[in-house]
Amino acid sequence: GANIGGISDFSDEFPFVDLMKSARDWIPGNSAGCFDCREPGSNPTCNAPNACPVTINRDANGFVSSLLPNQVVTTIVHAGGTPGRLSAGNYTLRFDGSGTIQLLGASQVSQVAGEIVANISSSTGNNIGFRLTAITGGNPLRNIRILPPGGVCNNDDHRFCDGAAPCGAGATCQLFTAAGVADAQLFHPRFLKNHEPFRLLRFMDWMGTNSSPIVNAADYPSATSAFWTRVPLTTLAALGNRLQSDLWINVPHKATDAFVDAMATVLRDDFTLDRKIYIEYGNENWNGIFSQNVEIPRQFCPGFADLAAGCQNDGVSGNGIACERDPNTFSLGAAQAPCFQALVRAWGDRSVQIFDRFDAIFGASARQRLIRVIAAQAANPDLGRQVMVRNATGQAFTVASKTDTYASAPYFGTDYCTPDNGINPDNNASVYASTEAFLDHLETSGLAVSRGFMQNSKAMLNANFAAEGIRHISYEGGQHLAGIGGFTFNSTCNLRFDEANRSPRMEQIYRTYLSDWKANGDEFTQFYSVGRYSVFGRWGTLEFQDQDVTTAAKYRAITGHTTVNPCHWVGCAQGGALPQLLFTNGFEGN
């Protein structure tokens, strides 16, 4: 399986035929030249005497309904990066309403009512987007769509076609600009092709789970929203149906019961009956870099009588808000211990509540269709034990009794270019002397560390939850070559990390890693499928959507391993095959 990278204009993956869905939300600027009025220090034109309103008037779907005086608004479809990652050619921008659209990073080819054709060069590494500089009152620009060049073969919705890549004998290329094609296709065929091998898709980033502000269903994008900053639930179900893959849903940590019920209802009704849905509360709730780490105990600590007072004795005391960090030291102060205990309790309690609400919505099919997940830290499996071993608050049953799988993230390469006794260029120069030397060390020492993560998590389950039959799976995994702290921008670290990830040797290292996993766990989900490399990580198995998969060592390793080991655990059902017809030519002569 795989995590799918988040929706962002900085991504070199374009999941949807309509590129407007993955574009950046509107940026408020002004006619004097300010790009973003929310950053007044970025440009003198953002400041007085120039008017620079930050409020954007929107309709129910998020399209701009009117412009304020001196206001312009911008969206970026693709942020600058390596030239050619966004395919060259003519892009068709369609819209209802009337106004003035200024292209950015593209040249206008033609314009008629409701449509602009723009050409994008393969040589550009600039930002690509457009700006609204005027809107006709009473008839604003809306229902904006951006359709790429090319199309999809009429006999294979996973096959992209254009003049250079025809469909072949007996098939026709349906252009994305043809009537109804973009809506029916929804997903770009190259995106579908890249994800064909994965039988489990984790939507943590697609749902914008980390530090999510989402509370109610109305806060979450719908199919008609201008931008899919978070991908609609109906679209998640549609992708699973199209690929015959299982889905992994991350419920936002602030979600109300009503929103949980709404999520469950959509998935029950829209997702195929013969595939599984994995349910997880939040993501990495233990991780202090995400707001859920303190917002979960802040929400639930007042309900724990023995902890409530202690949770108030935090880094910002006296304001009645629990579990707040000191803005200067990032410390919770004396509230560290009670807030941690509140997190452990609430994490288990709320997970069980969400599991039970999904069960109630799914009814008799719940145990066949739903996989209940508790996910915690690979380096500290005792945290997962603490969450699962206790009774749910006020109940006679344990959290473990309501849990099907325990998920860890057994990354390899976590010790390189990190502070606090890491394996770094300044203390282990020989490791970084060449890419081959680095890979030698990664293949031995790096894999040994991740193997220990896997074995320790498995041992924790065997020692504590054998009776419950909780299976060990991964919520993330793969290489973790990213500099931390002062090593983030270290040139030696980044050179070796880039070269190692692109080296053909990485394929065999991954194969060994996945064999280690097979001995210690069941479902594996790579983090993540497609994404550009940066100093903050080389997470993608592919660097960009159009990459030749034969040049991608990690992708080859994962798909090759899956081919040889399609299902190695009890109850596994391989995806990718459509349901058989009741009667076929082989059934009693039809």
Question: Model-flagged regions — what are they?
Answer:
Residues G1-D156, T172-Y281, W286-P579:
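Non-catalytic accessory regions flanking glycosidase/transglycosidase catalytic cores in CAZymes
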Residues G163, L236, F583-T584:
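Generic detector of short, well-ordered, non-transmembrane alpha-helical segments enriched
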